[in-house]
Amino acid sequence: MVPNPPISLAQGDDLIIGGRRFHSRLFTGTGKYPSMEVMQQSIKRSACEMVTVAVRRVQAVAAGHAGLMEAIDWTRIWMLPNTAGCTNAEEAVRVARLGRELAKLAGQEDNTFVKLEVIPDGRHLLPDPIGTLQAAEQLVNEGFTVLPYINADPLLAKHLEDAGCATVMPLGSPIGSGQGLNNAANIALIIENASVPVVVDAGIGVPSEAAQALEMGADAVLVNSAIALARNPAAMAEAMGQAVIAGRTAFCAGRLPRREEASASSPTTGLVSS
């Protein structure tokens, strides 16, 4: 069942997460870019308003992250600290707390957002459902606005929503794989049952897949690798931004219902006889 879309896509069709309003439904990342300058150009051309930052990499000044905090205009871009690299709930909670302090250093005193990642498997990078739920419950109790990265599991998504998460973020396919929406059927179930925004995260490789996610009724997408590893990252960022607008507009317009049989678009009455 496809969720009922808004009647029209008006100026007020903004995305609200944790009480904060976003015009853009594309979120981007900060990793894998060939240079800081390319990252800056890509963020600008994407027109995104929220960017995720790997707290552990910034804290350790990992390769490609030196100068990151100074490279982004945090008066315009909302920081989404993430717990990438954490393998269990305890680690994720500690890193989330560091992320909150990082946001404060960027001048965002009221930023409680965290993209929660608990990933014990370094090969496939699939999230741990039990650890994610445990960490989410703790972080919600501490006042965080939790955006959990999960497998496309409708039951887990509902448990996280019930725990107080501000969104759920099901993966389309494994991180960085570019395989697209391999889990479209389960994502559709999550969208149908969710009372919080659904953000498709991971696996999107091309703009058409971002558009597809929005056409399905997802509220937003998070795209990093497909932009950062493109031949022209800034151009791909712009294309992703346009695709998200197109997908959301199409969803709001309402798709043609699927039919078992053909239906002629030309009139069948009043035909000129031969």
Curated annotation (Swiss-Prot):
Listed EC numbers: 2.8.1.10
Binding site for 1-deoxy-D-xylulose 5-phosphate: 176, 202-203, 224-225
Biological or metabolic pathway of the protein: Cofactor biosynthesis; thiamine diphosphate biosynthesis
A cellular-component GO term for this protein: cytoplasm
GO molecular function: thiazole synthase activity
Active site: residue positions: 115 (schiff-base intermediate with dxp)
Listed Pfam families: ThiG
Keyword vocabulary terms for this entry: Cytoplasm, Schiff base, Thiamine biosynthesis, Transferase
Catalytic reaction equation(s): [ThiS sulfur-carrier protein]-C-terminal-Gly-aminoethanethioate + 2-iminoacetate + 1-deoxy-D-xylulose 5-phosphate = [ThiS sulfur-carrier protein]-C-terminal Gly-Gly + 2-[(2R,5Z)-2-carboxy-4-methylthiazol-5(2H)-ylidene]ethyl phosphate + 2 H2O + H(+)
InterPro entries: Aldolase_TIM, Thiazole_synthase_ThiG, ThiG
Source organism superkingdom: Bacteria
Biological process terms in GO annotation: thiamine diphosphate biosynthetic process
Predominant location category: cytoplasm
Compartment(s) where it occurs, according to its Swiss-Prot or TrEMBL record: Cytoplasm
Subunit structure: Homotetramer. Forms heterodimers with either ThiH or ThiS.
Functional note: Catalyzes the rearrangement of 1-deoxy-D-xylulose 5-phosphate (DXP) to produce the thiazole phosphate moiety of thiamine. Sulfur is provided by the thiocarboxylate moiety of the carrier protein ThiS. In vitro, sulfur can be provided by H(2)S.
HAMAP family: ThiG
Family the entry assigns: Belongs to the ThiG family.
Name of this chain's protein: Thiazole synthase
Organism: Parasynechococcus marenigrum (strain WH8102)
Encoding gene, per UniProt annotation: thiG
